[in-house]
Swiss-Prot record:
CC annotations in GO: cytosol; ribonucleoprotein complex; ribosome
Family matches, as NCBIfam families: PRK01151.1
Any one GO biological process: translation
Keyword Ribosomal protein: yes
Similarity comment: Belongs to the eukaryotic ribosomal protein eS17 family.
Gene Ontology MF: a single term: structural constituent of ribosome
A Pfam family annotated for this UniProt entry: Ribosomal_S17e
Keyword entries, A-Z: Ribonucleoprotein, Ribosomal protein
SUPFAM superfamilies assigned to the protein according to its UniProt record, in alphabetical order: Rps17e-like
Annotated protein name in UniProt: Small ribosomal subunit protein eS17
Length: 82
């Protein structure tokens, strides 16, 4: 069963991803440093949750891009065969 995150944690993680897409990583420790650097939160638990959700969000985003590229390649292959 997955974790349930509040809207605030999701919002902050998405904003971080949008602003610092090139620095966001699929590694938790790297994202933890990113959160420490750019987010002003005093709670360690909240920082860790934001970093964890950001990690998952990056992985999901990468998978979507890869799937979209694969489907485009497949469409191109099908068009070239006909």
């Amino acid at each position: 069963m997955g974790n349930v995150y509040t809207k605030d944690i999701k919002r902050v993680a998405r904003e971080l991803y949008d602003k610092f897409k090139d620095q966001a990583s699929d590694k938790y420790d790297d994202n933890k440093k990113l959160v420490d650097e750019y987010v002003n939160v005093s709670s360690k638990k909240v920082k860790n949750r934001i970093a964890g959700y950001l990690t998952r969000y990056v992985k999901i985003s990468k998978n979507k891009v890869e799937a979209q590229e694969a489907s485009e390649e497949l469409e191109e292959d099908l068009e070239s065969e006909t």
